[in-house]
Structures are given as structure tokens and as C-alpha cells.
């Protein structure tokens, strides 16, 4: 950018410097000037009004281009682009001032110099147009699409319970007002859409009430209710089984306890019976020696009496 600015400044300076006619002209030019002095003078010194008329359309074109570019540019342009535009405007002003000064001061210049100045101005404008096109900002903000805020209603204007189809139908409803009312404002469209959606909701609610088709939520609720009933029944059967097993275990334990008690009582009775028999046997053993002694004593008495009787007989 700096190099381009320096080049434009140099071009403006060279155009502003008056060009003096060389005295050492060729012989042919001198001959032509001597033969046709008036024609050469008019050819070398054109009317300044003609120059202004020639430069006016070019200046108008350049000003129109700058105005169009300013209208197209947005406020989100970077500082570098602003600085560049300011520099280009300053250069344009300097070039126009220099061109006017050269027109006023170079009334006696050659037509070739004017042609060179015109060519330099054209090249300057062409360079400006190229630079303006290349410096166009690339990161333009996208146009914001207005989406009206509408209260959502859980009524689906489509097949069954498909949410996607209902959303598509709603999007179609959103697009219809743009086609039917091209001159309407955003507020009118939103109010119209809200009224249409509310009317559609009131129409759809009684239809949905009249329909008795089972939905996914109903089927899910029934399945969950059936599974809960099955779980409750299984829990009840399990509890009944556990109670029965517990009763059986309690009965078995009570029977075992009663059997143990009966066996203990029988063992006690048998022990008592055996002890009684043992005591009776011991008593019998104690009585027998006494009877033997008495028998012996009786036998002794009987034998003694017999002896005494026999002795008396003798």
C-alpha cells in the first residue's frame, strides 16, 4: 500500500511540472510550424473548457464508483480498510487538484502532454477500481432471518404421533404468510400466526379426545402396570412359600423337641425301674442268710432232741 501511494504521488508531481518546449527541434517540426503556425498553435494550445469537458465524465465516474463502494461497505469494516479508503480519497483529491493546476498552468503545453496526463488519470482510476475490488471485505455479516416466536402446543397436525411430521407442518405454516402477505410487517405476521395456531389447536383437541386409539404412552403404561402386577404376584407367592417353609420347619423342630422330651422321660422311667429292681434284689440277698441260719438252728434242735430221746431210750 505504501508503495502504491508513493507511485501515485510521483505521478501527480510529474503531471504538475510544466513541460518546456525544446528549442532544438527537428527540421521537419520547424518546417511545419513555419508553414502552418495557426493550425499548430490551435493544435498545441487547446481550449481549457474542452479539457474540463473531457475530465468531467471521468471525475463523475470515479465519484460514482467511490459512492457505490461506500454504500456497499458495512460498519463492521476493519480499521485498515478505513485507513486505506481515507488514503485513497486524499490521493484522489490531490490528483484532482494537481490536474486542475496543470490545466491552468499548462495552457501552452503540447497535446502529447495532455494525452499523457489523460492516460495517467485513466491508469490511476483503473488502479483505484482494481484496488477497491480487491479490498472488499470478505467477512460480511450474514443477513439475519427473522423467526417469529410462537407458543408451542403439543398437537400434531400429521400422521399419528410423529413429532417430525408435526414440526414439518408447522414450518409450512410459518412459510405461508410470507407468500400471502408480502407487504405485511413482522408484528402482523406473528399475530396472524399465533391466532391461526390457537385456532388449529382448539380444532385439534376435540378430535384427539374423540379418538380412542392407544398411544405409545398408554401401551407403555399398560406394560408397566402388567409387569408390576406380575412382580407383586411373584412376591406374594414367594412370601407364601417362605411362610409355609417356616411353618414346616417350626413343626419339625417342635416334633423333634417333643421326641427328645419323651425319650428323656422314658430313660428316666427305665432308670427308676432298674434301680427299683436292683434294690429289691439286694433285699432278697439280705433275707436269704437269715433263713439259712434259722434252718440250721432248727435242724440242730431237732438233732439234739433226737439224741436226747435216744439216750433216754437207752
Curated annotation (Swiss-Prot):
Region (Disordered): 41-290
GO molecular function, one term: extracellular matrix binding
Keywords assigned: Biomineralization, Cell adhesion, Cytokine, Glycoprotein, Phosphoprotein, Proteoglycan, Secreted, Sialic acid, Signal
Classification via SMART domains: OSTEO
Modified residues (Phosphothreonine): 66, 185, 190, 237
Post-translational modification: Forms covalent cross-links mediated by transglutaminase TGM2, between a glutamine and the epsilon-amino group of a lysine residue, forming homopolymers and heteropolymers, increasing its collagen binding properties. Extensively phosphorylated by FAM20C in the extracellular medium at multiple sites within the S-x-E/pS motif. The phosphorylated form inhibits hydroxyapatite crystallization. Dephosphorylation via a mechanism involving ALPL/TNAP promotes hydroxyapatite crystallization.
Glycosylated residues (UniProt): 134, 138, 143, 147, 152, 234, 308
Signal peptide bounds: 1-16
UniProt short sequence motif Cell attachment site, positions renumbered to this chain: 159-161
Biased composition (Polar residues): 47-64
Residue positions where Phosphoserine is found in the record: 24, 26-27, 62-63, 76, 78, 81, 99, 102, 105, 108, 117, 120, 123, 126, 129, 191, 195, 215, 219, 224, 228, 234, 239, 243, 254, 258, 263, 267, 270, 275, 280, 291, 303, 308, 310-311
Residues carrying Phosphotyrosine: 225
Any single GO BP term: response to 2,3,7,8-tetrachlorodibenzodioxine
Family classification: Belongs to the osteopontin family.
Protein's name according to its UniProt entry: Osteopontin
Species, as recorded: Homo sapiens (Human)
Gene label: SPP1
Amino acid at each position: 500500500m505504501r508503495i502504491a501511494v508513493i507511485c501515485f504521488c510521483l505521478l501527480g508531481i510529474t503531471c504538475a511540472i510544466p513541460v518546456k518546449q525544446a528549442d532544438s527541434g527537428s527540421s521537419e517540426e520547424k518546417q511545419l510550424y513555419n508553414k502552418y503556425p495557426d493550425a499548430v498553435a490551435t493544435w498545441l494550445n487547446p481550449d481549457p473548457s474542452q479539457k474540463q469537458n473531457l475530465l468531467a465524465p471521468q471525475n463523475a465516474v470515479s465519484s460514482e464508483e467511490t459512492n457505490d463502494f461506500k454504500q456497499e461497505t458495512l460498519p463492521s469494516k476493519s480499521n485498515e480498510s478505513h485507513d486505506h479508503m481515507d488514503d485513497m480519497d486524499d490521493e484522489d483529491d490531490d490528483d484532482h487538484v494537481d490536474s486542475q493546476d496543470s490545466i491552468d498552468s499548462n495552457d501552452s503545453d503540447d497535446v502529447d502532454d495532455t494525452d499523457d496526463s489523460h492516460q495517467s488519470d485513466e491508469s490511476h482510476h483503473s488502479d483505484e477500481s482494481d484496488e477497491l475490488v480487491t479490498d472488499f471485505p470478505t467477512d460480511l455479516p450474514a443477513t439475519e432471518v427473522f423467526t417469529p416466536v410462537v407458543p408451542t402446543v403439543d398437537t400434531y397436525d400429521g400422521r399419528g404421533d410423529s413429532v417430525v411430521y408435526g414440526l414439518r407442518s408447522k414450518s409450512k405454516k410459518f412459510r405461508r404468510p410470507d407468500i400471502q402477505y408480502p407487504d405485511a410487517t413482522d408484528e402482523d405476521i406473528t399475530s396472524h400466526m399465533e391466532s391461526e395456531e390457537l385456532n388449529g389447536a382448539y380444532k385439534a383437541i376435540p378430535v384427539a379426545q374423540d379418538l380412542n386409539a392407544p398411544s405409545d404412552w398408554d401401551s407403555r403404561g399398560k406394560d408397566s402396570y402388567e409387569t408390576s402386577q406380575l412382580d407383586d404376584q411373584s412376591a406374594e407367592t414367594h412370601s407364601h412359600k417362605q411362610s409355609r417353609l417356616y411353618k414346616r420347619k417350626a413343626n419339625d423342630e417342635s416334633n423333634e423337641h417333643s421326641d427328645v422330651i419323651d425319650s428323656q422321660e422314658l430313660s428316666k422311667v427305665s432308670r427308676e425301674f432298674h434301680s427299683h429292681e436292683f434294690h429289691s434284689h439286694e433285699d432278697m440277698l439280705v433275707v436269704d442268710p437269715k433263713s439259712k441260719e434259722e434252718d440250721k438252728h432248727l435242724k440242730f434242735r431237732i438233732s439234739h432232741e433226737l439224741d436226747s430221746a435216744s439216750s433216754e431210750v437207752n
